[in-house]
């Protein structure tokens, strides 16, 4: 039996590394990866040459330039250009070299700032985007539309998934530009080590957010990639578009902070600074389609936070 040759682009990132971990447990596939030094995804000729020589059967497109609000505001040209180039180069090369299937990993920032909650797939392009990361979001929307367009024009089977807020091993724990879960894990860890009497969390604690462990994201990605084409098309008509991936359950930032305090073993007070901005009151993805396709998340928030904290400690 010939093994399927699967290229995971972005294998050193949080999602890409989780997909590689799960694929490598199987005996029927050969996982192909390249570091940035080995293959510059911004170089279209290099990408073409790679696909010409490697005979790839499937692609997981998890490579992206990512960053926090400050980075997105400081380098908007880099975010839109590099992400659009990575997507265009890989999707076009995959098409030219007859890659059967491709899965593009997007981001829930593609949806309008004031989207109806929970956010269904049909909310795409129904309103104005969040200004702070608009260039990144536009690039991710372009990736969805590239997949759609190659499906429509060339009868390709290129699919897209839109994850909610992700966390887990290999997340960015940088002190100044990490997302809420790694930022709070680090802050409570340091407060515990220093016996700090309280930890201040920005905002009122009332905004609702949804969080998905990266191992669940990887499992969902593989599940969606492996669906029969007819089943996929029935669930993404009329535009052969994208599917949301999340838990369908959200929690307040207050509940999140208190859970993290318990996981870390912090015994002091958790204080909310309501003078600081809260951001969007609620952001929850509608995952009805994903559930209809037979996939549900398995890692609870408590389990996921505990294992992520263990990874951080190691």
Segments predicted by a language model, with ranges:
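Active-site helix of classical SDR
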Residues: 135, 139-142
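NAD(P)H-binding glycine-rich loop region in Rossmannoid oxidoreductase-like domains
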Residues: 45-84, 96
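SDR active-site strand-loop-helix element
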Residues: 9, 34, 59-65, 102-108, ...
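Conserved beta-loop-beta element that borders a ligand/cofactor-binding pocket
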Residues: 101, 106-107, 144-172, 182-184, ...
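C-terminal substrate-binding subdomain of Rossmann-fold SDR/epimerase-dehydratase oxidoreductases
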Residues: 3, 9-10, 14, 18-22, ...
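Conserved Rossmann-fold NAD(P)-dependent oxidoreductase catalytic core, especially the SDR/UDP-sugar
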Residues: 88-133, 159
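Adenosine-cofactor binding site in Rossmann-like domains, unifying the SAM/SAH pocket
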Residues: 24-49
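Catalytic tyrosine of NAD(P)H-dependent dehydrogenase/reductases that use a Tyr as the general acid/base
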Residues: 127, 136, 209
């Amino acid at each position: 039996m010939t093994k399927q040759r699967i290229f995971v682009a972005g294998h050193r990132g949080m999602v890409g590394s989780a997909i590689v971990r799960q694929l490598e447990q199987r005996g029927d596939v050969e996982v192909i990866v390249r570091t940035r030094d080995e293959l510059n995804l911004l170089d279209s000729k290099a990408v073409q040459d790679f696909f010409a020589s490697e005979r790839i059967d499937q692609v997981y497109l998890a490579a992206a330039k990512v960053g926090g609000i400050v980075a997105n505001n400081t380098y908007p040209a880099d975010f839109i250009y590099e992400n659009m180039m990575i997507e265009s180069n890989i999707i076009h090369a995959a098409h030219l070299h007859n890659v059967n299937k491709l899965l593009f990993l997007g981001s829930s920032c593609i949806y309008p700032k004031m989207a109806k909650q929970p956010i269904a797939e049909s909310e795409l392009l129904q309103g104005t985007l969040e200004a702070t990361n608009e260039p990144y979001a536009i690039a991710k929307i372009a990736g969805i539309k590239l997949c759609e367009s190659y499906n429509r024009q060339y009868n390709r089977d290129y699919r897209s998934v839109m994850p909610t807020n992700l966390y887990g091993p290999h997340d960015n724990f940088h002190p100044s530009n990490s997302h809420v879960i790694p930022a709070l894990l680090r802050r409570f860890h340091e407060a515990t080590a220093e016996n700090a009497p309280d930890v201040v969390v920005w905002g009122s604690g009332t905004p609702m957010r949804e969080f998905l462990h990266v191992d669940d994201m990887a499992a969902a990605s593989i599940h969606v990639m492996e669906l029969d084409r007819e089943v996929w098309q029935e669930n993404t008509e009329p535009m052969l578009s994208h599917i949301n991936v999340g838990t369908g359950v959200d929690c307040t930032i207050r509940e999140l902070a208190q859970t993290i305090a318990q996981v870390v073993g912090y015994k002091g007070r958790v204080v909310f600074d309501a003078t600081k901005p809260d951001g969007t009151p609620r952001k929850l993805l509608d995952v009805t389609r994903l559930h209809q396709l037979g996939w549900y998340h398995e890692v609870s928030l408590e389990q996921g936070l505990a294992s992520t904290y263990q990874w951080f400690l190691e």
